[in-house]
Amino acid sequence: RDKHVTGVQTCALPIYPRTVYPGLADADLDVPAEKLISLMESTRVDKAIVVPLGPEDHYLGEIIEQYPGRFAGVGCYDGSAPDQAKNLDDRINKSNIQGIRIGEVDASADTPDDPRQFSMFPLLEAMSERNLRVWFYAESRQVQLLEKVLDVLPQLVVVFNHCGFMVSLDNLTVDQHYRPHFTTEVPPPTLELLGRLAERPNTYIHFSGQYAFSHDPYPYPDMLPVADFIYNTFGPNRMLWASDFPWIAEQPGYAQQLALVDHLLPNLTQAERQQITGGTAASLFDF
């Protein structure tokens, strides 16, 4: 049996407090872990990394405990926490998170030159000390600032989301299938910057989110140059497939999302395919 480990997945129940995104993740969104498990079993996917919609980890901690060996958790940045290091320790103890998703490095109107003065540096430093993974999804200016942080914190592990596209949430829309969509060039003009970050051995990248950027119908052939670039710069050992469940559950479908590995990277060896669909994630997370 093949062993696949999925990347970003989201589970949510209305009874738990969480962040609401109108039209995309309304308050009544009901995505129990059991729905994800059913799809995983039908596609021979064994394990999943789950990321909630906001900094509330209640359900995440519950399903990690309820299904031992099945899930690993990545939390979301909690901007309301007065002490980021303490917040991390509390969430590690309560919910066993192994990373934090963030979307910026400095929120200042006038960004300082010293990366140690960036608004998110205390969090990033605390994450590096605790060997937590940075789940990163941000626009290009913030990626450039992250590059400076990595000069100071070279051991910090960063996982770029969704094929390394660098987009602003200000540009986020919802498509006809109730999925996130960004209007952007394909290939994006930020590949050179992404390639610079790929030179650092502690950077990784999701093979995911193609539907949100592509101008073509499934299997998104305009994403072929992006897939090729990622393969050539990061390599299979730093690539991890992600489904982006639940947004893809209906269109294109969970199995179809997994099949994009073969559609967009048709020349992989079996060992490379297994690395992208499981080995890399297993090297980064404990299940």
Regions found by a protein language model. Name each.
Residues 113-240:
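Catalytic pocket-lining loop regions of alpha/beta-barrel enzymes
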Residues 1, 47-50, 72-75, 98-102, ...:
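Hydrophobic faces of well-ordered beta-strands that scaffold small-molecule active sites
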Residues 29-39, 81-92, 190:
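Short, acidic/polar
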Residues 40, 60, 91, 100, ...:
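Conserved, mostly hydrophobic/aromatic
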Residues 55-141, 147-148, 181-185, 210:
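Active-site gating/metal-coordination segments in enzymes
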Residues 17-55, 70-76, 98-105, 134:
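Divalent metal-dependent hydrolysis catalytic cores, especially in the metallo-beta-lactamase
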